[in-house]
């Protein structure tokens, strides 16, 4: 259960946790909503949840580890719908290339009897690939590990440096930021 919203809370943010109803039930038991928080049971692909979000003070959405389970067309439709509903808003999420998604999805794809891994959301160059979906999207990305850490720092271990180069280099793991702008 992700708590990014709580760790970023400045006491003025409205925090919405969205997940399937059974997950929200567990969340309500383990992490009851705080004063500025609302737990919304939903399927992200059903955009009815858009109307429950108060964007009067702006909107920043985090989707951590979510889109690996979505088809590319589902992510595209969701992002375009969010651009319609939340102009001026920002969506931040993690992504990786096809090789990494294949590795991530290896076990759950077998149990779900899914054969077409290629249909699942993966990107190598987020600004170019996602930016082409819609002119209202301003897309930037940084390496998942290298984008936020200085590998020249002597406190960074050799193992971390190796994993960072494989993750960010070979697998194109990245943190993607999409700003929704008007037409």
Q: What are the language-model segments listed below?
A:
Residues 1-183:
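Alpha-helical subdomain
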